[in-house]
Amino acid sequence: MSPLASTLNFKHDALVRAFAKKYKLSMASSEELFAHMLQWLWFLANRNLGHQPRHGFPTFPAQAPLDIYWHEFILDTRAYQDFCSTHLGGFLHHCPTPEGLEGASHELFLNNPQQQREINQMLLKKAMYEVHAKMGLETMLSWYLHLHQKHPHLVQT
């Protein structure tokens, strides 16, 4: 597992250019999102090390720019696998937020939307707290507020 600073030095110029072109971003914006995506992957790979098995981490619409970039990176399977081996201590699988995480489910949404909202708010608070504790206030604000405001066309609904 490499330190965050080393992970942030990873370059994939072809991916940055392709992402900028596909999503009509400036190179500077694509590079900024790429750096945040690297931080996001490092965070996911490093959470709970030595304490419990890795488990899903909830994502919210605000993380859509990071998630979309991750999807694009995964498509370059060799580069992604090499990156994971070198910087994350092994392959980081991409899994959707698990159905039933902390009781959240589509069925609950249909039957008790208020309870579903309360669970989602609790999950969001826990996620933001964990990111703040591990990555700092600036990163937490970027991931949960600024990136999706800056790139609304990348926010999934």
Question: How would you label these PLM feature ranges?
Answer:
Residues 1-157:
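Intrinsically disordered, low-complexity, repeat-rich regions
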